[in-house]
Swiss-Prot record:
GO terms for cellular component: cytosol. The active site is at K70. This is Shikimate dehydrogenase (NADP(+)). CDD domains: NAD_bind_Shikimate_DH (cd01065). Its EC number is 1.1.1.25. It is an enzyme of class 1 (oxidoreductase). Shikimate binds at S18, Y19, S20, T66, N91, D106, Y232. It comes from Prosthecochloris aestuarii (strain DSM 271 / SK 413). Keywords: Amino-acid biosynthesis, Aromatic amino acid biosynthesis, NADP, Oxidoreductase. It catalyses: shikimate + NADP(+) = 3-dehydroshikimate + NADPH + H(+). HAMAP family: Shikimate_DH_AroE. GO terms for molecular function: NADP binding; shikimate 3-dehydrogenase (NADP+) activity. It comes from the Bacteria.
Length: 290
Protein backbone atom coordinates (compact mmCIF):
# COMPACT_ATOMS: atom_id res chain seq x y z
CA UNK A 1 0.00 0.00 0.00
CA UNK A 2 1.35 3.45 -0.91
CA UNK A 3 1.66 6.29 1.60
CA UNK A 4 -1.54 8.25 2.21
CA UNK A 5 -1.32 11.89 1.13
CA UNK A 6 -4.97 12.80 0.48
CA UNK A 7 -8.14 12.41 2.52
CA UNK A 8 -11.61 11.77 1.11
CA UNK A 9 -14.77 11.28 3.10
CA UNK A 10 -18.52 11.23 3.57
CA UNK A 11 -20.51 13.81 5.50
CA UNK A 12 -23.99 13.02 6.74
CA UNK A 13 -25.91 12.24 9.90
CA UNK A 14 -25.51 8.80 11.51
CA UNK A 15 -23.82 7.34 8.42
CA UNK A 16 -21.57 4.71 9.98
CA UNK A 17 -23.55 2.09 8.05
CA UNK A 18 -22.27 3.41 4.70
CA UNK A 19 -20.43 1.17 2.23
CA UNK A 20 -18.69 4.16 0.64
CA UNK A 21 -15.44 3.77 2.64
CA UNK A 22 -15.21 0.12 1.57
CA UNK A 23 -15.78 0.99 -2.10
CA UNK A 24 -13.39 3.93 -2.35
CA UNK A 25 -10.61 2.52 -0.18
CA UNK A 26 -10.73 -0.77 -2.09
CA UNK A 27 -10.51 1.08 -5.41
CA UNK A 28 -7.65 3.29 -4.20
CA UNK A 29 -5.73 0.27 -2.96
CA UNK A 30 -6.27 -1.60 -6.24
CA UNK A 31 -4.95 1.37 -8.23
CA UNK A 32 -2.21 2.18 -5.68
CA UNK A 33 -3.51 5.72 -5.21
CA UNK A 34 -2.57 7.73 -2.08
CA UNK A 35 -6.16 8.37 -0.96
CA UNK A 36 -7.95 7.32 2.22
CA UNK A 37 -11.75 7.63 2.61
CA UNK A 38 -13.41 8.03 6.00
CA UNK A 39 -16.70 9.12 7.59
CA UNK A 40 -17.52 12.49 9.16
CA UNK A 41 -20.79 12.46 11.08
CA UNK A 42 -22.34 15.92 11.40
CA UNK A 43 -25.14 16.28 13.91
CA UNK A 44 -26.73 19.51 12.70
CA UNK A 45 -27.04 21.48 9.45
CA UNK A 46 -25.74 24.56 11.26
CA UNK A 47 -22.33 22.87 11.38
CA UNK A 48 -22.07 22.57 7.59
CA UNK A 49 -20.35 25.97 7.03
CA UNK A 50 -17.68 25.10 9.62
CA UNK A 51 -17.27 21.62 8.14
CA UNK A 52 -16.64 22.99 4.65
CA UNK A 53 -14.28 25.66 5.96
CA UNK A 54 -12.46 22.81 7.70
CA UNK A 55 -12.30 20.98 4.39
CA UNK A 56 -10.55 23.99 2.88
CA UNK A 57 -8.22 24.52 5.83
CA UNK A 58 -7.22 20.86 6.15
CA UNK A 59 -6.89 20.27 2.43
CA UNK A 60 -9.40 17.42 2.35
CA UNK A 61 -9.42 16.46 -1.33
CA UNK A 62 -13.06 15.52 -1.69
CA UNK A 63 -16.27 14.69 0.12
CA UNK A 64 -19.46 12.83 -0.59
CA UNK A 65 -22.60 14.31 0.93
CA UNK A 66 -25.64 12.31 1.97
CA UNK A 67 -28.93 12.92 3.74
CA UNK A 68 -29.92 15.27 5.19
CA UNK A 69 -27.33 17.73 3.84
CA UNK A 70 -27.41 17.41 0.04
CA UNK A 71 -29.45 20.59 -0.36
CA UNK A 72 -27.91 22.75 2.37
CA UNK A 73 -24.33 22.36 1.10
CA UNK A 74 -25.30 24.02 -2.18
CA UNK A 75 -25.26 27.33 -0.28
CA UNK A 76 -21.66 26.95 0.90
CA UNK A 77 -19.67 25.66 -2.08
CA UNK A 78 -18.06 28.03 -4.57
CA UNK A 79 -19.44 26.56 -7.80
CA UNK A 80 -22.18 24.12 -8.81
CA UNK A 81 -22.03 21.70 -11.73
CA UNK A 82 -24.87 21.63 -14.26
CA UNK A 83 -26.15 18.42 -12.67
CA UNK A 84 -26.13 19.90 -9.17
CA UNK A 85 -27.98 22.96 -10.43
CA UNK A 86 -30.54 20.78 -12.20
CA UNK A 87 -31.58 18.95 -9.03
CA UNK A 88 -30.65 21.55 -6.42
CA UNK A 89 -28.51 19.05 -4.55
CA UNK A 90 -24.84 18.13 -4.14
CA UNK A 91 -23.56 14.66 -3.32
CA UNK A 92 -19.91 15.22 -4.26
CA UNK A 93 -17.54 18.08 -3.42
CA UNK A 94 -14.16 18.53 -5.09
CA UNK A 95 -11.54 20.73 -3.40
CA UNK A 96 -9.52 22.62 -6.01
CA UNK A 97 -6.89 24.42 -3.91
CA UNK A 98 -9.48 25.73 -1.49
CA UNK A 99 -12.18 26.37 -4.07
CA UNK A 100 -15.03 23.91 -3.57
CA UNK A 101 -16.95 22.56 -6.56
CA UNK A 102 -20.34 21.00 -5.81
CA UNK A 103 -21.32 18.15 -8.13
CA UNK A 104 -24.09 15.57 -8.36
CA UNK A 105 -23.26 12.02 -9.40
CA UNK A 106 -26.64 10.56 -8.39
CA UNK A 107 -27.94 11.36 -11.88
CA UNK A 108 -25.14 9.27 -13.41
CA UNK A 109 -25.88 6.64 -10.77
CA UNK A 110 -29.39 6.28 -12.18
CA UNK A 111 -28.49 6.71 -15.83
CA UNK A 112 -25.53 4.36 -16.19
CA UNK A 113 -27.28 1.09 -15.17
CA UNK A 114 -30.09 1.86 -17.65
CA UNK A 115 -27.80 2.22 -20.69
CA UNK A 116 -28.36 -1.35 -21.99
CA UNK A 117 -32.10 -0.63 -22.20
CA UNK A 118 -32.02 2.75 -23.94
CA UNK A 119 -34.01 1.67 -26.98
CA UNK A 120 -36.67 0.03 -24.82
CA UNK A 121 -37.09 3.19 -22.75
CA UNK A 122 -37.23 5.70 -25.59
CA UNK A 123 -40.77 7.09 -25.95
CA UNK A 124 -42.14 4.56 -23.45
CA UNK A 125 -43.77 5.45 -20.11
CA UNK A 126 -41.52 5.27 -17.05
CA UNK A 127 -42.62 5.37 -13.42
CA UNK A 128 -40.94 6.48 -10.20
CA UNK A 129 -42.07 5.75 -6.65
CA UNK A 130 -41.17 8.74 -4.49
CA UNK A 131 -41.00 12.52 -4.50
CA UNK A 132 -37.73 13.33 -2.73
CA UNK A 133 -34.19 14.06 -3.85
CA UNK A 134 -33.60 10.55 -5.19
CA UNK A 135 -36.77 10.79 -7.28
CA UNK A 136 -35.62 14.15 -8.64
CA UNK A 137 -32.28 12.63 -9.70
CA UNK A 138 -34.18 9.84 -11.46
CA UNK A 139 -36.43 12.35 -13.24
CA UNK A 140 -33.40 14.29 -14.45
CA UNK A 141 -31.60 11.13 -15.66
CA UNK A 142 -34.67 9.98 -17.60
CA UNK A 143 -35.44 13.42 -19.02
CA UNK A 144 -31.87 14.07 -20.10
CA UNK A 145 -30.75 10.67 -21.36
CA UNK A 146 -33.74 8.46 -22.21
CA UNK A 147 -36.66 10.64 -23.39
CA UNK A 148 -39.58 8.51 -22.19
CA UNK A 149 -43.08 9.35 -23.39
CA UNK A 150 -44.07 10.04 -19.78
CA UNK A 151 -42.36 10.23 -16.40
CA UNK A 152 -44.97 9.17 -13.87
CA UNK A 153 -44.51 9.96 -10.20
CA UNK A 154 -46.42 7.57 -7.94
CA UNK A 155 -46.82 9.34 -4.61
CA UNK A 156 -48.77 9.19 -1.37
CA UNK A 157 -49.07 12.98 -1.22
CA UNK A 158 -49.96 14.52 -4.62
CA UNK A 159 -49.02 18.01 -3.39
CA UNK A 160 -45.41 16.87 -2.88
CA UNK A 161 -45.41 15.29 -6.31
CA UNK A 162 -46.67 18.54 -7.83
CA UNK A 163 -43.95 20.49 -6.01
CA UNK A 164 -41.29 18.25 -7.55
CA UNK A 165 -42.88 18.61 -10.99
CA UNK A 166 -42.93 22.40 -10.63
CA UNK A 167 -39.23 22.37 -9.71
CA UNK A 168 -38.41 20.46 -12.89
CA UNK A 169 -40.76 22.47 -15.10
CA UNK A 170 -39.17 25.73 -13.94
CA UNK A 171 -36.11 24.77 -16.02
CA UNK A 172 -37.58 22.19 -18.40
CA UNK A 173 -41.23 23.00 -19.11
CA UNK A 174 -41.34 20.28 -21.75
CA UNK A 175 -40.57 17.46 -19.26
CA UNK A 176 -43.47 14.95 -19.55
CA UNK A 177 -44.15 14.55 -15.82
CA UNK A 178 -47.43 13.05 -14.65
CA UNK A 179 -48.58 12.73 -11.02
CA UNK A 180 -50.47 9.66 -9.78
CA UNK A 181 -51.55 8.35 -6.42
CA UNK A 182 -49.71 5.25 -5.25
CA UNK A 183 -52.70 3.04 -6.11
CA UNK A 184 -52.99 4.04 -9.78
CA UNK A 185 -52.70 0.41 -10.83
CA UNK A 186 -53.32 0.74 -14.58
CA UNK A 187 -50.70 3.49 -14.85
CA UNK A 188 -48.20 1.35 -12.91
CA UNK A 189 -48.82 -1.74 -15.04
CA UNK A 190 -48.37 0.30 -18.22
CA UNK A 191 -44.86 1.51 -17.31
CA UNK A 192 -41.93 -0.08 -19.12
CA UNK A 193 -39.63 1.05 -16.29
CA UNK A 194 -40.39 1.34 -12.57
CA UNK A 195 -37.88 2.91 -10.17
CA UNK A 196 -38.14 2.74 -6.40
CA UNK A 197 -36.68 6.08 -5.26
CA UNK A 198 -37.83 5.69 -1.64
CA UNK A 199 -36.02 4.10 1.34
CA UNK A 200 -38.75 1.45 1.57
CA UNK A 201 -37.11 -1.95 1.89
CA UNK A 202 -33.83 -0.70 3.40
CA UNK A 203 -32.40 -2.96 6.07
CA UNK A 204 -32.84 -1.46 9.53
CA UNK A 205 -34.97 1.48 8.37
CA UNK A 206 -38.51 1.76 9.69
CA UNK A 207 -40.92 2.59 6.86
CA UNK A 208 -44.62 2.16 6.13
CA UNK A 209 -43.89 -1.19 4.48
CA UNK A 210 -40.98 -3.23 3.18
CA UNK A 211 -41.67 -2.92 -0.54
CA UNK A 212 -42.68 -0.20 -2.99
CA UNK A 213 -45.61 -2.47 -3.85
CA UNK A 214 -47.68 -4.60 -1.52
CA UNK A 215 -47.58 -8.40 -2.01
CA UNK A 216 -51.09 -8.38 -3.45
CA UNK A 217 -49.94 -5.82 -6.01
CA UNK A 218 -47.30 -8.12 -7.51
CA UNK A 219 -49.69 -8.82 -10.39
CA UNK A 220 -48.91 -5.29 -11.63
CA UNK A 221 -45.38 -6.43 -12.53
CA UNK A 222 -44.67 -8.41 -15.69
CA UNK A 223 -41.93 -9.59 -18.03
CA UNK A 224 -42.20 -6.50 -20.22
CA UNK A 225 -40.84 -4.27 -17.47
CA UNK A 226 -37.50 -3.13 -16.10
CA UNK A 227 -37.51 -2.80 -12.31
CA UNK A 228 -34.85 -0.60 -10.67
CA UNK A 229 -34.68 -0.51 -6.87
CA UNK A 230 -32.36 2.18 -5.48
CA UNK A 231 -32.18 0.33 -2.15
CA UNK A 232 -28.93 -1.68 -2.04
CA UNK A 233 -29.08 -3.24 1.42
CA UNK A 234 -30.36 -5.93 1.44
CA UNK A 235 -29.13 -6.96 -1.98
CA UNK A 236 -32.45 -8.61 -2.79
CA UNK A 237 -35.23 -6.40 -1.47
CA UNK A 238 -38.86 -7.58 -1.39
CA UNK A 239 -39.49 -5.37 -4.44
CA UNK A 240 -36.60 -6.99 -6.34
CA UNK A 241 -37.85 -10.45 -5.41
CA UNK A 242 -41.38 -9.62 -6.60
CA UNK A 243 -40.01 -8.31 -9.89
CA UNK A 244 -37.82 -11.36 -10.46
CA UNK A 245 -40.75 -13.69 -9.81
CA UNK A 246 -42.80 -11.73 -12.35
CA UNK A 247 -40.09 -12.21 -15.00
CA UNK A 248 -39.09 -8.54 -15.17
CA UNK A 249 -35.56 -7.31 -15.82
CA UNK A 250 -34.12 -6.40 -12.41
CA UNK A 251 -31.56 -3.68 -11.62
CA UNK A 252 -30.59 -3.89 -7.93
CA UNK A 253 -29.59 -0.79 -5.97
CA UNK A 254 -25.96 -1.86 -5.78
CA UNK A 255 -25.63 -0.84 -9.44
CA UNK A 256 -26.57 2.76 -8.64
CA UNK A 257 -24.30 2.70 -5.59
CA UNK A 258 -21.32 1.66 -7.71
CA UNK A 259 -22.11 3.97 -10.65
CA UNK A 260 -22.39 7.12 -8.56
CA UNK A 261 -19.28 6.14 -6.58
CA UNK A 262 -17.28 5.59 -9.78
CA UNK A 263 -18.26 9.05 -11.02
CA UNK A 264 -17.21 10.68 -7.73
CA UNK A 265 -13.95 8.70 -7.69
CA UNK A 266 -13.06 9.96 -11.16
CA UNK A 267 -13.81 13.58 -10.20
CA UNK A 268 -11.44 13.32 -7.22
CA UNK A 269 -8.63 11.20 -8.63
CA UNK A 270 -8.86 11.49 -12.40
CA UNK A 271 -8.80 7.69 -12.52
CA UNK A 272 -11.36 5.12 -13.64
CA UNK A 273 -12.69 2.97 -10.83
CA UNK A 274 -12.27 -0.79 -11.50
CA UNK A 275 -16.03 -1.28 -11.28
CA UNK A 276 -16.13 -4.99 -12.16
CA UNK A 277 -13.75 -5.85 -9.33
CA UNK A 278 -15.56 -3.51 -6.93
CA UNK A 279 -18.91 -5.05 -7.86
CA UNK A 280 -17.56 -8.54 -7.16
CA UNK A 281 -16.23 -7.51 -3.75
CA UNK A 282 -19.29 -5.58 -2.60
CA UNK A 283 -21.66 -8.33 -3.74
CA UNK A 284 -19.62 -10.77 -1.70
CA UNK A 285 -19.78 -8.44 1.30
CA UNK A 286 -23.54 -7.87 1.01
CA UNK A 287 -24.22 -11.57 0.50
CA UNK A 288 -22.14 -12.56 3.54
CA UNK A 289 -23.85 -10.25 6.02
CA UNK A 290 -26.50 -11.72 8.36
Amino acid sequence: MCSITSILGLIGRNVNYSYSPFIHNTAAEMLRLPFYYTIFNIADARQIPDALNGMRALGIAGLNVTIPYKQVVTEYVDTLSAEAQAVGAVNTIVNNNGRLSGCNTDIAGVSHPLKPYKERLHQSPAGIFGNGGAALAAVEALRRDYHPSAIRLFVRDPDKGLALAEQVHAKHPEAPIEIFKIDAYDAIRDCHLLINATPIGTKGVQTAGNSALLPQEQKLLHDGQIIFDMVYNPLRTPFVNMAAEAGAVVIPGVEMLIAQAAESFCLWTGETMPVDSIREKILKKLTAQP
